[in-house]
């Protein structure tokens, strides 16, 4: 709920760490289920702080502002309905995952080759000049991180509490800077992470091509028009959920999906007299739901 990328990565790290510790003790754990359980938390990401769809429509100047205005997060991710559903989803995952445990003879433990850890190393010289000492000292990180936090605080003080894409991006940048031990350490972490997401970066041009085809050929319009033809004001949110899950299989990026699907579904909401926030969260729920079978995020 805090950050989809942070949760996805931390979940994988925790699953791996738990499996490694279990391998050192007489305790057998089914590694595929452990990984799947950690990944399943991803199913509620669009309900949280980094929801790209909700943040998109909460950002002044967004693509659809002339039609729906700015939709505050209090109507989307901070609504009582969304918070309740998020907690229910989290509880359901916690209950279901342990029930999927296989028989002891079918347990697959972690591969010993995966236990070898690779951590970014920073080599410090015995004698460093002023610039080198500066880039290996934490003071610059803390200074920059605090400046960003102060800026966010001033923004909240002037405009009240609200979230948009810029605020979320600045928040996580400030946290990354403060938690890193030095500027050079922060850079090394970024470089190391870039190697991890390389397979995702490689896929983006292909999925962008699919997104372009769906947008320019009218395929997205056809799918959405069909949904609208059978939807009512009471069921539009549900059909937005189904269409969001379907389109996500072709456009896995939440922001990219909304750019293609959002305008059409918003027009549907306006024509049926439905609150646009219902469609926004319907598409968001569909996106996060089908991520469980979307291979894009699991390849790394």
Per-segment meaning from a language model:
Residues 78-89, 95-203:
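Hydrophobic transmembrane alpha-helices of multi-pass small-molecule transporters
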């Amino acid at each position: 709920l805090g950050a989809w990328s942070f949760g996805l990565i931390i979940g994988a790290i925790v699953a791996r760490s738990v499996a490694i510790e279990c391998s050192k003790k007489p305790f057998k754990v089914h590694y595929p289920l452990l990984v799947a359980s950690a990944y399943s938390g991803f199913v509620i990401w669009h309900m949280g702080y980094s929801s790209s769809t909700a943040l998109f429509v909460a950002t002044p100047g967004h693509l659809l502002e002339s039609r729906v205005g700015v939709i505050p997060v209090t109507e989307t991710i901070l609504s009582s309905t969304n918070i309740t559903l998020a907690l229910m989803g989290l509880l359901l995952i916690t209950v279901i995952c342990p029930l999927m445990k296989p028989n002891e003879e079918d347990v697959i433990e972690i591969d010993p080759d995966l236990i070898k850890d690779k951590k970014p190393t920073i080599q410090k010289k015995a004698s460093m000049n002023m610039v080198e000492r500066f880039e290996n000292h934490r003071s610059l990180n803390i200074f920059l991180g605090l400046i960003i936090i102060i800026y966010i605080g001033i923004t909240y003080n002037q405009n009240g509490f609200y979230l948009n894409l810029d605020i979320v991006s600045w928040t996580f940048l400030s946290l990354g800077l403060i938690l890193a031990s030095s500027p050079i350490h922060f850079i090394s972490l970024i470089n190391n992470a870039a190697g991890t997401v390389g397979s995702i970066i490689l896929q983006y041009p292909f999925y962008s091509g699919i997104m372009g085809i769906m947008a320019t050929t009218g395929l997205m319009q056809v799918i959405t028009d069909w949904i609208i033809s059978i939807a009512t004001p009471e069921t539009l949110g549900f059909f937005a959920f189904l269409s969001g899950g379907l389109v996500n299989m072709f456009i896995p990026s939440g922001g990219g999906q909304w750019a293609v699907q959002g305008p059409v579904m918003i027009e549907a909401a306006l024509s049926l007299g439905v609150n646009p926030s219902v469609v926004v969260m319907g598409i968001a729920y569909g996106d996060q739901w089908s991520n469980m079978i979307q291979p894009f995020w699991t390849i790394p």
